Each structure stands twice: as structure tokens, then as C-alpha cells.
């Protein structure tokens, strides 16, 4: 406890004695609440626990019929994703003795469960905790001190631990016994060059600083012990490979398959916080991740992984990667010089489960994960750009290509400033092509409200601005040059002088007294049986088939 008091003293907190008692009580209450929660809720710390949880909630279907990992499994899963269907566990897969799990996080609700949350509303609470850690400010009041103290205490609880008899080492295969073709890898689209790994955690280490990076990258099968990797040049693993090349060293790599979905969410969160992904996962889950040392490389992996692939990348050794379906909804191009991974060891649990997913036009699992992350990012973005009241990354725009910002507009040009601040607030927003800015009273999650704001408040000559030749997603082939493209901002806010010299008209609204009277008399009109809460988009000309 003394470390926290020193922290508060450092920042000049005057009511240390009172704060200490309150903080200690807060932490003790937190620990008691966690113990109580253990009795009534499954703590998801590995994939099998999550599968059990989904089955208990009626959100899992076991498929015992023989299925083919070549196209068939993906087609079945795609139909589930389109309709928000249950997770699927294929127990009889052609050519492999391993089961295949897919669509585990096919809804935002299941993503929340994976993160030990019950409801999407709790995602912003988690985001507030991360915002405190991202840029801690000196506490000025007792409640602020408690909030910061609890956040720092959560960091201590989230520290990873070492497991010396990990489940992922129950079976060990080395040398000639390493055969990736025996794994039930999926080929998703008929034009894919080969089978792919999509939900493997790639763990690498900086050869100089020893900093570990955990990322999710698409791998493509090349031979029984080799794969190629597709990644962006800004990712952590690519920096590690460049440093290894400068030193003339191989880059050691571990691919953890079938991990706790919570860890996948942590690895998919590219937040600029000086925390490892393992610590991040511990913050997400409320307790530290159990790690195990690999057999042939100097890396650690989640101890409860279903499978682990251990290997190396030799700088300059490459293979032909692609084509393969990607998140843009098209086949990606062929990379003639993709980094080549050589694997010398496979470890796995007894009767391992292969967890997978696939990319493509939404809805896909990555889109559901992005919707959850959107809620987590919101408090962090508000901290960076306080005038942003809310923001939304629509799934149909690939979850990052278009952002809709609701701002508390205070002065002329405020919308443009908010857009520019958004693009630089977090690294992942660098690749957002379109930013639409609306007033704070606009429902940014209702496309009708957003389109109305654009149609009624935008003069294209005045309110649309373009930034040319900015860093861009190299997989976005809409640009003329790979890795370089433009960005567009659309100011759909109410205008004020000197943005306009014309009087801005007042929007139409129902008379509040009349609306209240109609609410009271609704049953008297004989209309109580009508359900006006659900909107049928077909009534407004939309075709949502």
C-alpha cells in the first residue's frame, strides 16, 4: 500500500490520511467482489473454458458430421455470421484428428463474454481504466485518487506468471515430426493460393531491448514446415525483423494457436501504452496471464494454448504469398517476397482444438471485435480530444475506413480541428479514409440521422476537405500508389459566422407539451397494441437481404 501513498505524495495530494483509508477499503472491497464473482461466474482463462461458457448459454453448436476444411467449414461459418448465429465446434474434420472452433466471437455480446464482461455498456468502463493508465494525471480529489489507485492496483494484479507444467507442452513434436499439413487449416475462398492461419498470436522479441511484441497476422501454408506472413510495415514484429537483420541474426518466432479469446482481444488492441500485451490481457481479465517458456526458442507463450508453433525467420529468406481473401472484401495481391517462417517444433495439448476465423466483407468476427474495441477506445479518444463526445466506426466501412465523430462545437473551424486531431490521436486511426463530423445531438449510430446531417448541413465547396498523399493501408488497392493515399473530412455540423453569412434555420421538432400529452393518451387512441419501437428498414426503401 505504501507505494500508492508515495505516488499521491509525489503529486501533492493533501488529504493523504483520509485517502489512504478510503483507498485501502476500496481495494479490499474489490477483492471481496472478485471472490464472490468466482462462485457465480465462469472465469474464462482458456479457450476450453470459453467454449464451456458458450455452451452453457446456448451459444454453441457441436457439428459431428464430417466436414472439409477446404471451403466447406468457411461456407457454413459465413452463413452463421450473416445472421448472428451461434459459435461452431466441428468435431469431425476431414484429414485431421483435431477439432475446429469458429465464430467464437461472432457477436459483440460474445466478445464481451470473452473479456469477462456481461454487457457492451461495460466496455466503456474498461476504456476509462485504460485511459487513466495511458495518461495519468495528478489526482485533485479523493474520488480521483481512488480511481487512479484502483487502476494502478489492477496493473499489479495483471502481472503475468510462469507455469512450469503447462498444458500446451503435453505433446511435443520436433524435427521431421513437424508437419503443418496435418493441422486442420482452412482454405476460405476458391481463389486462395493455399490454406491460412488467421487467429494465431505471433510472439517476437526485440533483439536489443528484449521487448516482446504480440500480434495477430495472417500466415499462409507453403510446405510441411514453412509458412509466409502478411503484415504491415508499421507492426511491432516487422520492426523486430529489421533489427535482427541489422545484427545479422535470425528472428525467433512463436505462434500460439487456440488461446484464451481475451488474449486475442488484447493483442488486437494497438494502444500507445507502455504495457506489454500480456499485462494488457491481465488488465482485461482482472488477473495475470499464465505463461510458459517455449521448447526451442527464447520466448514465452500462453500456457493454456491449444497449440504452439516454434520457428525462426531468416532475414532475406522469402516466399510467394497470395492471393488470399482479405478484410477489404477482395483478393489481396501476390507478394513475391513475403517473409518465410521455418518451424522446428510443435507443442500441443491432448486432443487440441484449432481456433480460427477468416477475413472478408463484413460481417466477420473481426468486425464484431472492432465494434467492441470502438467502445473501449471512446474514453481514451475523449482524453486526447475532449471536444469529441462520441465516435463510431461503422462495420460496413471495414471498421476503420470511416469514422463518425459527434463533437461539442464551440467555435468556427472546430469540426476540422476535431478531424485532424482524430487522425493523430491513436496509431490505428492513421488509416481512416473518411471522417464525418456532426453535432453532439446527432445519433451517430443511426445512418438516417447521419445522412440527413450531411444532406442538410454540408456545402461541398466549403465543408469537404482533402489531405493528399498521407500514409495509407498498403492493402487498400483503391489508392493510386501502394501505401500512400488521401483522406477526406466532411463537416456536417451546424455552421456559425464566419463559416456562413446566412442565418442558420432552426431544425423542426415536435412541440414537447403536445408530445407528452400524446404519450399519456396513446392507449386511449386505441394504438397501444402497435409496436413502434422496431424499425423495418424496408419501409424506407432499404433492402437489407
Where do the PLM segments sit?
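Short hydrophobic targeting helices and cationic amphipathic motifs
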Residues: 6-8, 30
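Generic detector of N-terminal low-structure segments
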Residues: 9, 15-18, 24
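Short hydrophobic alpha-helical segments enriched in small aliphatic residues
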Residues: 12, 19, 34-37
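Extended, highly charged
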Residues: 39-340, 344-545
Amino acid at each position: 500500500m505504501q507505494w500508492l501513498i508515495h505516488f499521491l505524495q509525489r503529486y501533492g495530494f493533501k488529504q493523504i490520511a483520509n485517502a489512504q483509508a478510503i483507498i485501502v477499503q476500496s481495494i479490499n472491497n474489490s477483492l471481496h467482489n472478485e471472490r464472490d464473482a468466482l462462485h457465480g461466474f465462469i472465469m474464462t482463462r482458456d479457450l476450453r473454458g470459453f467454449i464451456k461458457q458458450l455452451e452453457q448459454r446456448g451459444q454453441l453448436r457441436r457439428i459431428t458430421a464430417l466436414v472439409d476444411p477446404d471451403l466447406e467449414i468457411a461456407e457454413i461459418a459465413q452463413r452463421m455470421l450473416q445472421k448472428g448465429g451461434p459459435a461452431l465446434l466441428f468435431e469431425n474434420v476431414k484429414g485431421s484428428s483435431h477439432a475446429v472452433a469458429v465464430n467464437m466471437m461472432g457477436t459483440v455480446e460474445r466478445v464481451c463474454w470473452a473479456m469477462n464482461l456481461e454487457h457492451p455498456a461495460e466496455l466503456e468502463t474498461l476504456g476509462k481504466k485504460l485511459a487513466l493508465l495511458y495518461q495519468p494525471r495528478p489526482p485533485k480529489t479523493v474520488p480521483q485518487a481512488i480511481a487512479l489507485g484502483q487502476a494502478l492496483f489492477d496493473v499489479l494484479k495483471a502481472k503475468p506468471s510462469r507455469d512450469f507444467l503447462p498444458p500446451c507442452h503435453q505433446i511435443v513434436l520436433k524435427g521431421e515430426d513437424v508437419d503443418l499439413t496435418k493441422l486442420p487449416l482452412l482454405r476460405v475462398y476458391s481463389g486462395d493460393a493455399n490454406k491460412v492461419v488467421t487467429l494465431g498470436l505471433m510472439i517476437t522479441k526485440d533483439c536489443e531491448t528484449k521487448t516482446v511484441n504480440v500480434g495477430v497476422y495472417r500466415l499462409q501454408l507453403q510446405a510441411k514446415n514453412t509458412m509466409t506472413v502478411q503484415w504491415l510495415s508499421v507492426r511491432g514484429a516487422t520492426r523486430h525483423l529489421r533489427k535482427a537483420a541489422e545484427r545479422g541474426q535470425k528472428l525467433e518466432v512463436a505462434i500460439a494457436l487456440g488461446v484464451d479469446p481475451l488474449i486475442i482481444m488484447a493483442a488486437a488492441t494497438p494502444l500507445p501504452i507502455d504495457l506489454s500485451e500480456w499485462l494488457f490481457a491481465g488488465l482485461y481479465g482482472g488477473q495475470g496471464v499464465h505463461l510458459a517458456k517455449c521448447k526451442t526458442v527464447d520466448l514465452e507463450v500462453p500456457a493454456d494454448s491449444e497449440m504452439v508453433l516454434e520457428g525462426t525467420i531468416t532475414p532475406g529468406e522469402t516466399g510467394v504469398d497470395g492471393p488470399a481473401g482479405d478484410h477489404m472484401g477482395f483478393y489481396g495481391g501476390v507478394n513475391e517476397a513475403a517473409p518465410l517462417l521455418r518451424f522446428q517444433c510443435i507443442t500441443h495439448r491432448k486432443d487440441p482444438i484449432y481456433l480460427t476465423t477468416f477475413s472478408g466483407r463484413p460481417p466477420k468476427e473481426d468486425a464484431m471485435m472492432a465494434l467492441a474495441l470502438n467502445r473501449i477506445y471512446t474514453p481514451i479518444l475523449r482524453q486526447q480530444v475532449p471536444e469529441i463526445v462520441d465516435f463510431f466506426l461503422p462495420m460496413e466501412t471495414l471498421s476503420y475506413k470511416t469514422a463518425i465523430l459527434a463533437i461539442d462545437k464551440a467555435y468556427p473551424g472546430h469540426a476540422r480541428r476535431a478531424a485532424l486531431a482524430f487522425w493523430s490521436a491513436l496509431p490505428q486511426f492513421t488509416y481512416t479514409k473518411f471522417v464525418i463530423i456532426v453535432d453532439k445531438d446527432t445519433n451517430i449510430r443511426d445512418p438516417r440521422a447521419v445522412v440527413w446531417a450531411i444532406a442538410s448541413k454540408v456545402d461541398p465547396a466549403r465543408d469537404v476537405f482533402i489531405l493528399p498523399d498521407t500514409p495509407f493501408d498498403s492493402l487498400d488497392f483503391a489508392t493510386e500508389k501502394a501505401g500512400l493515399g488521401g483522406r477526406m473530412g466532411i463537416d456536417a455540423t451546424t455552421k456559425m459566422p464566419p463559416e456562413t453569412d446566412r442565418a442558420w434555420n432552426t431544425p423542426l421538432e415536435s412541440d414537447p407539451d403536445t408530445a407528452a400529452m400524446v404519450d399519456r393518451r396513446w392507449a386511449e387512441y386505441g394504438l397501444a397494441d402497435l409496436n413502434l419501437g422496431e424499425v423495418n428498414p424496408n419501409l424506407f426503401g432499404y433492402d437489407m437481404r
